[in-house]
From Swiss-Prot:
One of its GO terms (cellular component) is extracellular region. PROSITE patterns: SNAKE_TOXIN. It is found in: Secreted. Coiled coil: none annotated. It comes from Dendroaspis angusticeps. This is Synergistic-like venom protein.
Amino acid sequence: MKTLLLTLVVVTIVCLDLGYTLTCVTGKSIGGISTEECAAGQKICFKKWTKMGPKLYDVSRGCTATCPKADEYGCVKCCKTDRCNK
């Protein structure tokens, strides 16, 4: 009986998401990039390109709760795995 109870506890711990925190690449293309753990409720990484001129884009990355909209002359990539927005 104790073995069954212990097995159930172990299976429960393995199957539950106990405080998993998403890690995203953050920063701008000009200021350098790093990684950070996202705050509670932020379960999406994003990478946003904004066209600044011919062949010139400003790129920003980070964590978000909802995928941001692309600007008229840009695009956005959203994803949900660690460092998927490189």
